[in-house]
């Protein structure tokens, strides 16, 4: 893979964007593309830095960077890659602005939604994808708040952090390749109809909330400052009464049972051959897209970092699991497949 060529073409695409026009105060930051052993940053080739993992924003030598793993997520085209890097640059912008409302991935992974919560969310997603007024969407959201407010808060924070970054990335894509953006929005609407998990769904519900707000002429806060954007939008609207559709509740119950069974089978297969280590561990690193929890166990599919009692950090790659303490950020046992 010619990393330098990709880098130069992405840099040219980014130079075409007016960043403050995408979001007030937004400015680009340096970006890097990398493979398992090589990276390009500021136009220079180098060995892959140890802190480069995933597609995200990282702080390296006191500077926020947007990074992209070209092997794990090979781009289809340069405009799409540039828009994805705008998403990651927006996270750097959020850090620089002092954003406080970061979601807790471990709470999201460890908390199972109630059937009614999940069904109302599916109804909300259908309203978003179908073009319903924002007041109807947020009235359904308000109904969920009465069921599991702590879980909804983490989802709404995810929507604010990741959904806003995704929205800004799509605005960039609309300027670089309008046809590609139209396709991305259509696929996003379809994903909302497919009962996505709480984390993944926020990447799609967030942009649609912001798009609908723009269409309805509602002001959106430039720097949320910790309060979810959905809450700030709801205060500007009169919310109607809404009712849960019974068929969605029945479907939610079926889906939850299937998901429980699948998680239990995944954990059973791992525990059958795993070596168990007792201890006091703090979960300090993970791939948030590869976390599943069931019956007090947290499964990780790709990467997990645990701070041990002596202060050292143990890094695990590949499937493993931990038994969670009452606090989902701590674990009392580690299960790693025997080699």
Task: Report residues per predicted region.
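Alpha-helical scaffolds flanking conserved acidic
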Residues: 79-83, 182-186
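Surface-exposed polar/charged interaction patches
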Residues: 16-20, 143, 239
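Post-HExxH zinc-binding segment in Zn-dependent metallohydrolases
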Residues: 37, 96-151, 155-181
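Active-site recognition of the HExxH zinc-binding catalytic motif
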Residues: 83-96
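Alpha-helical structural motif
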Residues: 6, 120-124, 164, 205, ...
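A metal-dependent hydrolase signature that marks the N-terminal structural subdomain at the beginning
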Residues: 1-80, 312-339
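Non-catalytic terminal regions of proteins
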Residues: 70, 221-339
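Active-site-proximal alpha-helical
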Residues: 150-179, 186-246
């Amino acid at each position: 893979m010619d990393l330098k060529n990709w880098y130069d073409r992405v840099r040219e695409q980014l130079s075409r964007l007016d960043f403050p026009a995408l979001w007030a105060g937004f400015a680009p930051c340096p970006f890097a593309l990398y493979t398992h052993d090589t990276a390009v940053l500021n136009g220079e080739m180098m060995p892959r830095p140890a802190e480069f993992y995933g597609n995200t924003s990282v702080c390296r030598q006191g500077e926020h960077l947007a990074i992209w793993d070209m092997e794990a997520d090979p781009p289809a085209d340069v405009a799409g890659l540039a828009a994805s890097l705008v998403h990651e640059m927006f996270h750097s912008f959020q850090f620089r602005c002092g954003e406080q409302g970061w979601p807790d991935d471990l709470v999201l992974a460890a908390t199972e939604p109630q059937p009614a919560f999940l069904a109302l969310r599916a109804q909300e997603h259908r309203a978003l994808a179908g073009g319903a007024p924002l007041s109807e969407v947020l009235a359904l959201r308000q109904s969920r708040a009465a069921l599991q407010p702590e879980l909804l808060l983490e989802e709404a924070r995810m929507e604010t952090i990741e959904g806003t970054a995704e929205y800004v990335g799509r605005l960039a894509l609309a300027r670089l390749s309008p046809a590609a953006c139209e396709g991305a929005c259509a696929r996003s609407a379809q994903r909302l109809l497919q009962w996505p998990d709480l984390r993944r769904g926020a990447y799609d519900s967030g942009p649609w909330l912001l798009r609908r707000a723009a269409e309805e002429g509602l002001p959106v806060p430039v720097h949320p400052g910790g309060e979810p954007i959905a809450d700030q939008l709801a205060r500007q609207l009169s919310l109607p009464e809404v009712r849960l559709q019974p068929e969605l509740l029945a479907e939610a119950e079926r889906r939850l049972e299937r998901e429980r069974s699948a998680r239990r089978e995944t954990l059973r297969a791992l525990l059958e051959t795993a070596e168990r280590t007792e201890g006091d561990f703090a979960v300090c690193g993970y791939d948030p897209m590869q976390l599943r929890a069931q019956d007090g166990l947290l499964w990780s599919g790709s990467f997990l970092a645990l701070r041990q009692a002596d202060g050292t950090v143990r890094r695990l790659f590949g499937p493993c699991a931990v038994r969670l303490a009452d606090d989902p950020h701590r674990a009392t046992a580690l299960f790693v497949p025997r080699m």
